[in-house]
């Protein structure tokens, strides 16, 4: 259950000039990504600006993207919430649409203890037993770290199939890998950590950079899997400046700027996010030119 491949793109949400969701551009971008290294599209997560999307907008995005990439890529729906009841309702509705899985973020702001976090994910899994769930641990945004021991207990649930691990900690990822069966997939939640996490048994990455270099990320992962460590390392080091540039300010501000520099009409970010300032824009443009991406 729930093989999502190696490169999962945390896809941006395009907006029109009036701030409404541009479903047409979303569908076009999804096809482009599916044709350029992306195995699975992760919709309406952090990079997709889920905090400023309504549930109705999210469901419509799921529908449009599912139709556009049918047979080319899988779709994971971001349905997480800091309300267990709300997360269950959203996940059940997304499941009926036909998504291939759901991303479930650690509940934010209310900071449940580990027992509460475990019960939260257990409840969602039990309410949607046929839908693969991917845990999402990003304590820098949620204020709470999902401990490896908690992850290990959740990994025993048949439809909790993996984790997007975004602590940036080799220690944490190593302990998760040590405590969970190899069938439980660890995905790096940070592009710069992908190669290091592959070394301790990760499956791949939920990537922002794959909007721009999806094929190269596939090549890096496949090279590592084939034992061509130097090739994988060289790709990692070549792309490392891009990995850092895409987080010069709050994600997804830089990646949207990069896509616009490539000619994609993805619009701005919704407030309270804002446009990239001149310094960020110039640094990002320099990296993109250095890598011949614009």
Swiss-Prot record:
Tell me which residues bind pyruvate: 47, 206
Instruction: Name the InterPro entries on file.
Output: Aldolase_TIM, DapA, DapA-like, Schiff_base-form_aldolases_AS
Q: Which GO terms describe its biological process?
A: diaminopimelate biosynthetic process; lysine biosynthetic process via diaminopimelate
Compartments where found: Cytoplasm
Tell me which UniProt keywords the record has, alphabetically: Amino-acid biosynthesis, Cytoplasm, Diaminopimelate biosynthesis, Lyase, Lysine biosynthesis, Schiff base
In this protein, the active site sits at 136 (proton donor/acceptor), 164 (schiff-base intermediate with substrate)
Which residues are in coiled coils?
none
Where on the tree of life does the source sit, at the highest rank? Answer: Bacteria
Could you tell me what reaction this enzyme catalyses? L-aspartate 4-semialdehyde + pyruvate = (2S,4S)-4-hydroxy-2,3,4,5-tetrahydrodipicolinate + H2O + H(+)
Question: EC number(s)?
Answer: 4.3.3.7
**Does the entry feature the keyword Lipoprotein, yes or no?**
no
Record PROSITE patterns: DHDPS_2
Q: What class of enzyme is it?
A: lyase
Give the PANTHER family listed for this entry: 4-HYDROXY-2-OXOGLUTARATE ALDOLASE, MITOCHONDRIAL (PTHR12128:SF66), DIHYDRODIPICOLINATE SYNTHASE (PTHR12128)
> Could you tell me what this protein is called?
4-hydroxy-tetrahydrodipicolinate synthase
The organism's lineage is: Bacteria, Bacillati, Cyanobacteriota, Cyanophyceae, Nostocales
